[in-house]
Amino acid sequence: MMKVAADDTELIKVELIEPQAALYNVAAPYNLTIGAQGSGKSHNIGIGSGFFVEYCPNVIGIIAANTYDQLSRATLKETFGTWKEIFGWTEYNAKANPGGFFVIDKEPPAHFKNHGHTFKSNNNNIYFANGAVVFVASLENYTVIEGVEVGWGMLDETADTREEALTSVITGRLRQKGLCAAKEPIDGIFPYCPSDHPAAGKPVNPLFVFTKPA
């Protein structure tokens, strides 16, 4: 069990099975989780990406899946549900949900913290109220990822992904500076931190791969 500080006043208990919890025991550049359908892989993407957004908002992340259908209908659907359940984050809407924490494919509202980046387009970008940015992508069209730099990545259902997409494109994009292994887990739960954090250790750009058995 992990306790997540969703804000300054509330602690939320998160139940993780052992393979899920193992991802947060140590900071590592490559992290592989193999599980059958329904084993909680996408749920763990929601938890892990939420931690990076919460603790390392200045570092851009990427969430990708093998196909666009997989990305939109499963990976992101589960991720958004996990963000709401664990962190209390929902999509911002000026009229329907003015207290929302993120926007998708659109310019963030003025009250969101400035993320400090210049992007040609807002397509496939998720912007958060604390200034964090996460790209989303389909690995069936992996060449569109070329040219971007990210600090961490989470890939879902990669069993059928072309090897070049992983070895040449994704790993080559993991080079944004600003993310380090934490000498001591932040809040006792998260082994990564910004490079300017007092607990910052060696620089790292972690890649998390979640896939089914071959």
Predicted regions and their residues:
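Phosphate/NTP-binding elements of NTP-utilizing enzymes
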Residues: M1-A214
